[in-house]
Regions:
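Structural recognition of alpha->loop->beta junctions
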Residues: 69-85, 157-183
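Short, solvent-exposed loop/turn segments at secondary-structure junctions
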Residues: 20-21, 54-59, 131
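Non-catalytic pre-domain segments flanking phosphatase-related domains
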Residues: 1-8, 179-192
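Active-site neighborhood of HAD-like aspartate-dependent phosphohydrolases
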Residues: 1-47
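Substrate-recognition element of Asp-dependent hydrolases with the DxDx(T/V) motif
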Residues: 32, 36-72, 82-98
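Acidic, Mg2+-coordinating phosphoryl-transfer loop and its flanking beta/alpha structural elements
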Residues: 123-169
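Conserved Lys-Pro-Asp/Glu-containing loop-to-beta segment of HAD-superfamily phosphomonoesterases
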Residues: 101-134
Length: 192
C-alpha cells in the first residue's frame, strides 16, 4: 500500500486571510485537485493531514470543518479520484499538543491507522511544519510544492537550506509533483 500524505491549506487550496471557515471560502489551487485525483487513480491512497487551530480558538466549529472537507472530497470524486481520510489537529499552538505539526502525532496516527511501513509513505506540502512532522517519523520521500506558504521561495537549484529536512524534493505545484511521482513509479515498474 502506498500512501501520499498531503497538507491542506496552501497545498490543495488557496490560503485565506486568516482561517477558512466556510465551504465557499475553500478555493482549490488550479490543478491541485486534478493532481490528487490522478494519484488516486494510479493506486495511491491519498490522506490529508492538516492543522486547524481555528477549532481550538473557536473561530470555526467541527460542523463547518466537515462541510469544507465534504466539498473537497466531492470535488476530487467528480474528477475520478478519492481522498481516503482527513486527519486534523484542532489545537492552537498554545495548547502544546502532540498532533499539531511539526509534532509527529498526526503522521503517527496515519501510519498506525493504515498499518504501513514508513517506506510506503510520501509527504507533500507547502509548509515546513508538514515536512518536519513527516521527517520526524522517518517518511523517506518529502516533497515541497512552491504554492501557499512556499510560493515566494526562490529555489533555483532545488536544494533547500536548513531547517528544511534534508533530501526534500522541490516542485512548482501539485501537477509537477504528480508528474514526478508517476514517472518514478513507472520507471521502477519498468526496471523490474
Amino acid at each position: 500500500m502506498k500512501i501520499a500524505i498531503f497538507d491542506r491549506d496552501g497545498t490543495l487550496n488557496v490560503l485565506g486571510n486568516e482561517y477558512i471557515a466556510t465551504p465557499d471560502e475553500w478555493i482549490p489551487i488550479p490543478g491541485a485537485l486534478e493532481a490528487v485525483a490522478r494519484l488516486s487513480r494510479a493506486g495511491w491512497h491519498v490522506v490529508i493531514a492538516t492543522n486547524q487551530p481555528g477549532l481550538g480558538r473557536g473561530v470555526i466549529d467541527v460542523h463547518a470543518l466537515n462541510a469544507i472537507h465534504s466539498r473537497m472530497l466531492k470535488q476530487v470524486a467528480a474528477l475520478g479520484g478519492r481522498i481516503d481520510a482527513v486527519f486534523f489537529c484542532p489545537h492552537s499552538d498554545a495548547e502544546h499538543c502532540s498532533c499539531r505539526k511539526p509534532a509527529p502525532g498526526l503522521m503517527e496516527q496515519i501510519r498506525d491507522r493504515y498499518g504501513v511501513e514508513r517506506s510506503e509513505m510520501v509527504a507533500v506540502g507547502s509548509a515546513l511544519s508538514h515536512l518536519q512532522a513527516a521527517a520526524a517519523i522517518g517518511v523517506p520521500q518529502l516533497h515541497l510544492v512552491c504554492t501557499g506558504a512556499a510560493a515566494e521561495m526562490d529555489v533555483p537549484t532545488g536544494v533547500l537550506p536548513a531547517p528544511w529536512p534534508e533530501g526534500t524534493h522541490v516542485h512548482t505545484d501539485l501537477t509537477a509533483f504528480a508528474d514526478f511521482i508517476t514517472a518514478a513509479r513507472a520507471a521502477k515498474a519498468t526496471a523490474h
